[in-house]
Structure formats: structure tokens, C-alpha cells
UniProtKB/Swiss-Prot annotation:
Region forming the signal peptide: none
Superkingdom of the organism of origin: Eukaryota
Subunit structure: Trimers of identical alpha 1(III) chains. The chains are linked to each other by interchain disulfide bonds. Trimers are also cross-linked via hydroxylysines. Interacts with ADGRG1.
Pfam families to which the protein is assigned, alphabetical: Collagen
Entries under PANTHER family matching the protein: COLLAGEN ALPHA, COLLAGEN TRIPLE HELIX REPEAT
Keyword list, A-Z: Collagen, Disulfide bond, Extracellular matrix, Glycoprotein, Hydroxylation, Repeat, Secreted
Stretches the record annotates as Nonhelical region (N-terminal): 1-14
BP terms from Gene Ontology: cerebral cortex development; negative regulation of neuron migration; positive regulation of Rho protein signal transduction
GO cellular component terms, semicolon-separated: collagen trimer; extracellular region
Organism ancestry: Eukaryota, Metazoa, Chordata, Craniata, Vertebrata
Post-translational modification: Prolines at the third position of the tripeptide repeating unit (G-X-Y) are hydroxylated in some or all of the chains.
Protein name, as recorded: Collagen alpha-1(III) chain
Compositional bias annotation for Pro residues: 22-32, 82-94, 890-899, 1025-1037
Length: 1049
């Protein structure tokens, strides 16, 4: 029969409970979520219904270029074409004189100064409180999370066998206790050595009840118990790697282009007005607002030296502006249109490598993404430029705690798990069978000190103590680490328009930029009212002959015009030299024959006779057919700048243009001078309290400390000195966006910033198609110069935004400056040298031709074969100056019509007197590129206009309409912190924040120092007498002390 030792008493008893099994390994991480299915390709767009005429629809994108037709056959020389249409306005003229400074704005009201809170004096030390009545033991708190299993104690040294105590008096039999739960069977202990049988001693007297002996040697450990309950989930694993990106969906098909609306009908040409009286010099006009600085144009070819202009009258000295009071700060205005793309900024230095972030919670396996909805009909968009690298996304919210997975099949042994949670004590084993009384041994010597007892259990939580007095305010701690970027705040209300401020100093001229790429041709704008003709300019000299260009493609067929009135008979030209034989072209249709010229004798050319007096101007003929577009020659020399004409009354404001595309980020300018401190604004409203963070997983249970001895009440100490600043706190979760504070008052204007360094010239892009001249928008009032803020942090280069929808075409602007001198035509084939003839007689003035009937719009005819070159006609007489037309009111912008075929070259109209200048309208939206029109004939150089009188100072213009907000830019990278600003006044105390959610449990702290040994508890009250036990077995017969003796007890 084997006996096991009770560990506590050293007495043979039942088997000890096995130690709880080790914590199970952490479950394997869930599989990564599958990538979402790619979205189905968008269905092809439906064909839009035909647009109703009259509604202003946005201009459609430019259509693909048509296929190049087969090369035409060389036609025969055609007749000289009519003068082409008026060319596009030339490059912008010279910079106008600077406008007079605007009236300074009114001074704003001074903001409310925040009051600095005074530091309170340290309070007097509190009186010593009386010892409170010891509270009753509270109800045990909820069971905490399982603690980590403590380290296994080292087995103590086996104690020496204690002296056997005297047998105590037999106690009364106790009540039988309830049967305990069955204990786990331990391994059978090793058999003990059988004691020797000692000599029978004499019966001793009953001794005093013996004290309990020292603990005996620890029995052999039982067999390992059954595996303990599975350990709690381990610490959350590291953040899983991002799954593979889903397959991008196929791009949507480009929808079919809707059919073009019906073309507008051509208006009936108006009748020519009677010649007006020569205009007088107008009254001195107010100077217009200073125009925006235009972009530097490409340098043109140097033109011939112009004639010296007349000395202008000296301007009147401007009046000194009144010192204005600072205007009230208006509410923020609408977001202005995005600027043009600037040059790419310089590459910034690489940022510091970020430290490893904290491990995120264990993610849950993602569900497979749903199939994307079929894309709607795709709009036919303009092919965008490739987007830049996207900004880093904001960190997502922490994933929810994953559910405990079902037990899987036994896998391979995983990595060593973290210490498991301390298991609950196993069920109490059954009381073993009563051991047999051992033989009485001799008294043993004192045993060595036994191992330290186990730590006592922590008592229930006591009632909360009274609140202590408030301590002194601690020193401000060092600044904590940079917090996470908060969520974007809500947009504030739009501000009032600021008062016009004084103009800043003139900046340095930037380096001339490289000419940008050729833009797409804009849609042809609506035809404005006819402007009054300008005075005729002087005739320019003949430019150098340009090189012969290649043959241009045939233009689309135009409607045939009605026959024009026959021109005057031309003078016979000299015979040209023999030209090279050209390829034989197809026979052209016979053109209408002109008046036969007087055939001159092929003789040597005589001296030119005097020009006869001009005859009366004939009525303008009907529009003739346009010839094939000629090859453009080289650009002629640029003419001298014309004198500034008189300023007309301002025209009505145009419609606002569509916002332009986002410009490339410009190069970083020099750091501006620090601005002056603005007046303190009113205290902002307190932001809402941050939401509670998610509760973290329960931390492991710390090691149970020993119960310390209760200390006496301490005396009240003096208030301690100010402690050192604490370590910086950890970053809190970003709170929700705070409400917008009340707008602060405007600070005084800061000193002007230093001029920025001239930007580096950009890379030359491909030349784009020239668009129609946009109309200049009405200048908005100049805002007050704000104080320069601290140096901002450089953001990442934003991706280029998509082009906005084209806006409505703007109203027609005022006539542009004098255009660049047209290119010289290519030289004609050299004719044969004729014989020199005698000088011809002076011709008589020609007769006035009869006025032709106004032609009607004909149907477009097919392209005719080019006719032969006719004889050059004589130069016609210069027409009379027409009367100035009344400035027409700008009409409402009509819907952009479909791109029509290239129009025929019309006859060059007579130059009318200069009409009144209209107010610059807003910039028109960019239209689709129109077809290239035929090249017009070189116009005559008008006479130089007289110098206009300096106008009066103009009134400030109305504020422009706010532009639509541009697209939101990408989030820039966190830049370097700016210089610390001056410390502001202490604001009022905000309301106390709500209690935050319980934070994540911290890691297991190191075991605390061993507590002092507790004082011996008070002696317990004597227990109730037990119930008499069952009678014991009869004792062994004792030695007989005589007849009839009784056995000794």
C-alpha cells in the first residue's frame, strides 16, 4: 500500500492536485482577407439626345483629327483670292502705366484682449484629518482578468524530521464534513521505508497537547495534471501586411458624341452708315484699374524703327491717399479658382525615417468584397495627364477584437507562446483515508527554517478615500510628441469682402519664362457688335520674302458667293520672267472674267507714272469664294508699339469664366519677414470632448504581493515642492473636428515681404494651337495685405486636377492692340523679261461702280478646282473712314454651336473709327479647337494715332463674383515645425472633458519589492465545541498493573 504526503501537513494523505497545465499556444492568425472582385467594366454610354437649340450646353471635347485625304492633283494657277479675314489680335501691348494707389481701407475694431489668468498662491497645508471609522469590508469586486501564472517556486530544502510531539488528548469527534469534490489522482508515491519496531515503552502520562510540527519534506510531485483551460488570446499580433491590390476595373467606354445642334443662321449684313465727322479729342477719362501683370510673351522679331510720337501732356500729380482705418475682418471668402499650373518645385530633402509604430490589434479576416456595380455611361472626357503619386491615406480605425475561432484540427507545434494566464485553482481533492498512526519516534532536533509562505490573497477593495486638497500647478512639461493629424475641420462661413488695401511694392521682374506649349484653339466666340473703325495707320514697308511653303490641304467647301461688282480696270503690269515649268494640273472651272486690261506692249518697263486722283469708293462686293489656304510665310518684323488711345467708358461686366486648371506648384520662395503680432482675437469656443477609445484587451494579472502591515496614520506633511516635468504623454486618439471659432479681427498690416527669387525657367513645351483671345475679367478690389505668417511646411506636389467643365463663352471684349505686322506673301513665279516700254500716260480717275445687291447665303458648294493665276489687279483707292458705330450691349452668351467648317475668306472691311473701349470682361471658357482658317491677306498699315490725354483716376470696380471652389488638394506630408510664435495670453479655462474610456492595459510590470512581514493577527475567538466524534477502536491491552487493572488511555 502506497501513501502520499500532504504537502502542507507532511502527513500522509490524499494525492495533491496537479499543477495547471501550460497555457495553450496562441491560435494561428486568420487568413488575409481576399481582395475584392474587380468592378465590372462600365457599360458603353448611351447616345445623348440631340441638344435643343438655344440652351447653353458646355462645349464638347475636340473631336479626333480627321484622316488625311489623298494628295490633290496640282491645279492650275487660280485667280488672286480676296483679302482674308482679320487676323487674331497680336501679342499684348506694352505695359500700361501704373494705376494710382487705391483708397486705404477703414481701420477695424480692436479685438477683445484675452485676460491672463493669475497664478494662484499655494494653499495652506491642510489640517490633519481624524482617522475615519474603518469601513466595512465591501463586497468583493468583479473578478479581474486572469493573471499570468507566477513562476514556479523552487522546492524548499527538506526539513529535518521534527521531534514527535506528545500525543494530545483525544478530541471530541467532529461532525463529518461534506464530501469534497473528487481530486485528481496523483501518481502513487514511492514506498516509504518501513520503520523499525521500537521497544515497547512504558506508558507515559498524558502530556499536554503537542504543537503542530514543522512542515515535513515535500512529497514527490504528482503526475502532471490534465491540460489546463486554454490560455487567453495572446497579445495582438503585428499589423498584417496589406493585401494585394484588387484588379482595377476596365475603363468605361467613351460615350458616343451627341449630334450637333442646328447651326445658327447668318445675319443679314447691315447697311453701311454715312461717314461721320472726324472725332474730337474726348474729355479726360478716368484711368482704368491697374491690369494684372501679363505673362512675358515670346520675343518677336525686331521691327523697323517707329516714328517719334508727339510729346504727351504732363500728367497731373496724384493726390495723397487718406490714411484708412483697418477694415473689419470679413468672413472667409469663397475659395478662389485654382491657379495655373506652375513649374515643378525642387525636390525636398528626404524626411527623417519614422520610428516603428505600435503594433495594431489583431485584424479580422476580411470578407470578400462585393462585385462592383456596373459603371454608368462614361462621359467622353479629355484625356488627362497621368496623376502624381497619391498621398498616404489616413490611418484607418483600429479593427475590432476578433472572435474566438473554433478549435481547429491539431496543427504542428506553433512558436512558443507568451506566458499564459494563471489558471484557476483546481477542485479540492477528496479527503484521503485516515492515515495510520506512526510509531512514536524520539524527539528530533530543531529543524531549519522552512521556505517562505505563500503570499496572502488580496483583500476586497475598500471604500474610496476622501478627496485630497488640490495641489499646486506643476511646471509645464516638455512638449509631447507631435500628435496625429486631426480630422479636417468644418468650413467656416464665407467672409465679407475685404476693403481695398494699398498696393504692395512692385516685385522684381521674374526671369523670362520659356514659351509654353501650344494650347488648343478655342471655340469661336459670338460675333459682337461692329466696333468703330480706328484711324488708318501708316503703311508699313515691304518685308523680306518668305520661303516658299508646301502646299496646304484643301479646306472644306464653302457656300458659293454671288458675283461681285467688276473692279476698276487695272494698269497693265510688266511682264514677268519665265517661270519654271510646273506639273500640268487639271483644268479648272473658268472663273468670272474681269474687265480686260489694256494690253501693253511687251517692251522695257518705263518709269512709273504719277498716281491719278482717287476715284469714289465702290460699294463692297459680295463675298467671293475662298481660295485654298496658302502656306504661311515667315513672320514679318514686329511693328513699333502704338500710342495709347483714349480710354472709353467702362462696359458692362462680363460673365464669370470657369475656373482654370490647377497649376504646377511653383518653386519655393524665400522666407518672408516675420509678421507683426496681431491683436488677440476673442477666445474660441471649446471643442467637443474626444470620444472614448476602444477598450483594450485585458492585461495579464500581476504577481500577488504579500500583505503588508497596517501603518499608523501619518502626520500631515508640508506641501511638497514642484516636481520635475513629467515625461511627454502618449498621443491621444484624434478627436472629432472642433467647431469653427469666431473669426478673429484683422491684425495690422505686416511689413512687405522680401521679393522672391526669380523662378527658374520652365521646360519648353510643345507649341499649342492658338485659342481665341479671352476677355479680360473685371478686376476685383485689392484686399488688404495680411501679415505674413510663419514659414509653412512644404507640402507634397499635388496631383494635377482634372480639367473643369468649360464655362459659357464670355462676351466679346474691347478691340485688342495693334497686331503684329502680317507675314509677307510668297514670291510669285518670275516672269519673262519683256521689252522696255515707254512710260504710260497718267490714268483718269475711275468711275464709281454700281452697288451690288446683297448676296444671300448660298448652300455650300463642292470645292472647285483651283483656277489659274489671274493678272494682278491695280491697288484700289483707300476708302473713306466710316462713322463710329454705337457700342452695342453685350448679348447673352448663346450655347456653343458645333464646330463648323472653315469659313470663306471675306473681303476686308474698311477701317472704321475707334469705338469706345468696353470694360474688360471675364475670361471666357476654353472652347474646342476650331479648324484652321485660311490665311488672310496682309492688311495695310494704319496711320499712327495721336497720343491720348491722361485720364482721371477711375473708381474702384465692383468686387468680382466668387469663383467656384477648386478641387481639394491631396494631403501634404507633415512638414517641419515652424518657428515658435510669441506666447499668447492664457485663455479661459475650458469645460472639463468627459471621462475617457479605459485605456489599454499596460504590459506586465516587474514584480514589486517584497512587502514587510505582516504583524501577527489577533488571536481568534475560541471556536464552538465540536460534536462528539464516533467512538474509536478499542485500545491495545496495556500492561497489567494488577488484577482487574484497566488499560491506560
Amino acid at each position: 500500500e502506497y501513501e502520499a504526503y500532504d504537502v502542507k501537513s507532511g502527513v500522509a494523505g490524499g494525492g495533491i492536485a496537479g499543477y495547471p497545465g501550460p497555457a495553450g499556444p496562441p491560435g494561428p492568425p486568420g487568413p488575409p482577407g481576399t481582395s475584392g472582385h474587380p468592378g465590372a467594366p462600365g457599360a458603353p454610354g448611351y447616345q445623348g439626345p440631340p441638344g435643343e437649340p438655344g440652351q447653353a450646353g458646355p462645349a464638347g471635347p475636340p473631336g479626333p483629327p480627321g484622316a488625311i485625304g489623298p494628295s490633290g492633283k496640282d491645279g492650275e494657277s487660280g485667280r488672286p483670292g480676296r483679302p482674308g479675314p482679320r487676323g487674331f489680335p497680336g501679342p499684348p501691348g506694352m505695359k500700361g502705366p501704373a494705376g494710382m494707389p487705391g483708397f486705404p481701407g477703414m481701420k477695424g475694431h480692436r479685438g477683445f484682449d484675452g485676460r491672463n489668468g493669475e497664478k494662484g498662491e499655494p494653499g495652506a497645508p491642510g489640517l490633519k484629518g481624524e482617522n475615519g471609522v474603518p469601513g466595512e469590508d465591501g463586497a468583493p469586486g468583479p473578478m479581474g482578468p486572469r493573471g499570468a501564472p507566477g513562476e514556479r517556486g523552487r522546492p524548499g530544502l527538506p526539513g529535518a524530521a521534527g521531534a514527535r510531539g506528545n500525543d494530545g488528548a483525544r478530541g471530541s469527534d467532529g461532525q463529518p464534513g461534506p464530501p469534497g469534490p473528487p481530486g485528481t489522482a496523483g501518481f502513487p508515491g514511492s514506498p516509504g521505508a518501513k520503520g523499525e519496531v521500537g521497544p515497547a515503552g512504558s506508558p507515559g502520562s498524558s502530556g499536554a497537547p503537542g504543537q503542530r510540527g514543522e512542515p515535513g519534506p515535500q512529497g514527490h510531485a504528482g503526475a502532471p495534471g490534465p491540460p489546463g483551460p486554454p490560455g487567453s488570446d495572446g497579445s495582438p499580433g503585428g499589423k498584417g501586411e496589406m493585401g494585394p491590390a484588387g484588379i482595377p476595373g476596365a475603363p468605361g467606354l467613351i460615350g458616343a458624341r451627341g449630334p450637333p445642334g442646328p447651326p445658327g443662321t447668318n445675319g443679314v449684313p447691315g447697311q453701311r452708315g454715312a461717314a461721320g465727322e472726324p472725332g474730337k479729342n474726348g474729355a479726360k477719362g478716368d484711368p482704368g484699374p491697374r491690369g494684372e501683370r501679363g505673362e512675358a510673351g515670346s520675343p518677336g522679331i525686331a521691327g523697323p524703327k517707329g516714328e517719334d510720337g508727339k510729346d504727351g501732356s504732363p500728367g497731373e500729380p496724384g493726390a495723397n491717399g487718406l490714411p484708412g482705418a483697418a477694415g473689419e475682418r470679413g468672413v472667409p471668402g469663397f475659395r478662389g479658382p485654382a491657379g495655373a499650373n506652375g513649374l515643378p518645385g525642387e525636390k525636398g530633402p528626404p524626411g527623417d525615417r519614422g520610428g516603428p509604430g505600435p503594433a495594431g490589434p489583431r485584424g479580422v479576416a476580411g470578407e470578400p468584397g462585393r462585385n462592383g456595380l456596373p459603371g454608368g455611361p462614361g462621359l467622353r472626357g479629355i484625356p488627362g495627364s497621368p496623376g502624381g503619386p497619391g498621398s498616404n491615406g489616413k490611418p484607418g480605425p483600429p479593427g475590432s477584437q476578433g472572435e474566438t475561432g473554433r478549435p481547429g484540427p491539431p496543427g504542428s507545434p506553433g512558436p512558443r507562446g507568451q506566458p499564459g494566464v494563471m489558471g484557476f485553482p483546481g477542485p479540492k481533492g477528496n479527503d484521503g483515508a485516515p492515515g495510520k498512526n506512526g510509531e512514536r519516534g524520539g524527539p528530533g532536533g530543531p529543524g531549519p527554517q522552512g521556505p517562505a509562505g505563500k503570499n496572502g490573497e488580496t483583500g476586497p477593495q475598500g471604500p474610496p478615500g476622501p478627496t485630497g486638497p488640490s495641489g499646486d500647478k506643476g511646471d509645464t512639461g516638455p512638449p509631447g510628441p507631435q500628435g496625429l493629424q486631426g480630422l479636417p475641420g468644418t468650413s467656416g462661413p464665407p467672409g465679407e469682402n475685404g476693403k481695398p488695401g494699398e498696393p504692395g511694392p512692385k516685385g522684381e521682374a521674374g526671369a523670362p519664362g520659356i514659351p509654353g506649349g501650344k494650347g488648343d484653339s478655342g471655340a469661336p466666340g459670338e460675333r459682337g457688335p461692329p466696333g468703330a473703325g480706328g484711324p488708318p495707320g501708316p503703311r508699313g514697308g515691304a518685308g523680306p520674302p518668305g520661303p516658299e511653303g508646301g502646299k496646304g490641304a484643301a479646306g472644306p467647301p464653302g457656300p458659293p458667293g454671288s458675283a461681285g461688282t467688276p473692279g476698276l480696270q487695272g494698269m497693265p503690269g510688266e511682264r514677268g520672267g519665265p517661270g519654271g515649268p510646273g506639273p500640268k494640273g487639271d483644268k479648272g472651272e473658268p472663273g468670272s472674267s474681269g474687265v480686260d486690261g489694256a494690253p501693253g506692249k511687251d517692251g522695257p518697263r518705263g518709269p512709273t507714272g504719277p498716281i491719278g486722283p482717287p476715284g469714289p469708293a465702290g460699294q463692297p462686293g459680295d463675298k467671293g469664294e475662298s481660295g485654298a489656304p496658302g502656306v504661311p510665310g515667315i513672320a514679318g518684323p514686329r511693328g513699333g508699339p502704338g500710342e495709347r488711345g483714349e480710354q472709353g467708358p467702362p462696359g458692362p461686366a462680363g460673365f464669370p469664366g470657369a475656373p482654370g486648371q490647377n497649376g504646377e506648384p511653383g518653386a519655393k520662395g524665400e522666407r518672408g519677414a516675420p509678421g507683426e503680432k496681431g491683436e488677440g482675437g476673442p477666445p474660441g469656443a471649446a471643442g467637443p470632448a474626444g470620444g472614448s477609445g476602444p477598450a483594450g484587451p485585458p492585461g495579464p494579472q500581476g504577481v500577488k504581493g504579500e500583505r503588508g502591515s497596517p501603518g499608523g496614520p501619518g502626520a500631515a506633511g508640508f506641501p511638497g515642492g514642484r516636481g520635475p516635468p513629467g515625461p511627454p504623454g502618449s498621443n491621444g486618439n484624434p478627436g472629432p473636428p472642433g467647431s469653427s471659432g469666431a473669426p478673429g479681427k484683422d491684425g495690422p498690416p505686416g511689413p512687405p515681404g522680401s521679393n522672391g527669387a526669380p523662378g527658374s525657367p520652365g521646360i519648353s513645351g510643345p507649341k499649342g494651337d492658338s485659342g481665341p483671345p479671352g476677355e479680360r475679367g473685371a478686376p476685383g478690389p485689392q484686399g488688404p495685405p495680411g501679415a505674413p505668417g510663419p514659414l509653412g511646411i512644404a507640402g507634397l506636389t499635388g496631383a494635377r486636377g482634372l480639367a473643369g467643365p468649360p464655362g459659357m463663352p464670355g462676351a466679346r471684349g474691347s478691340p485688342g492692340p495693334q497686331g503684329i505686322k502680317g507675314e509677307n506673301g510668297k514670291p510669285g513665279p518670275s516672269g519673262q523679261n519683256g521689252e522696255r516700254g515707254p512710260p504710260g500716260p497718267q490714268g483718269l480717275p475711275g468711275l464709281a461702280g454700281t452697288a451690288g445687291e446683297p448676296g444671300r447665303d448660298g448652300n455650300p458648294g463642292s470645292d472647285g478646282l483651283p483656277g489659274r493665276d489671274g493678272a494682278p489687279g491695280a491697288k484700289g483707292d483707300r476708302g473713306e473712314n466710316g462713322s463710329p458705330g454705337a457700342p452695342g450691349a453685350p448679348g447673352h452668351p448663346g450655347p456653343p454651336g458645333p464646330v463648323g467648317p472653315a469659313g470663306k475668306s471675306g473681303d476686308r472691311g474698311e477701317t472704321g473709327p475707334a469705338g469706345p473701349s468696353g470694360a474688360p470682361g471675364p475670361a471666357g471658357s476654353r472652347g474646342p479647337p476650331g479648324p484652321q482658317g485660311p490665311r488672310g491677306d496682309k492688311g495695310e498699315t494704319g496711320e499712327r494715332g495721336a497720343m491720348g490725354i491722361k485720364g482721371h483716376r477711375g473708381f474702384p470696380g465692383n468686387p468680382g463674383a466668387p469663383g467656384s471652389p477648386g478641387p481639394a488638394g491631396h494631403q501634404g506630408a507633415v512638414g517641419s515645425p515652424g518657428p515658435a510664435g510669441p506666447r499668447g495670453p492664457v485663455g479661459p479655462s475650458g469645460p472639463p472633458g468627459k471621462d475617457g474610456a479605459s485605456g489599454h492595459p499596460g504590459p506586465i510590470g516587474p514584480p514589486g519589492p517584497r512587502g514587510n512581514r505582516g504583524e501577527r493577527g489577533s488571536e481568534g475567538s475560541p471556536g464552538h465545541p465540536g460534536q462528539p466524534g464516533p467512538p474509536g477502536p478499542p485500545g491495545a491491552p496495556g500492561p497489567c498493573c494488577g488484577a482487574g487493572g484497566v488499560a491506560a488511555i
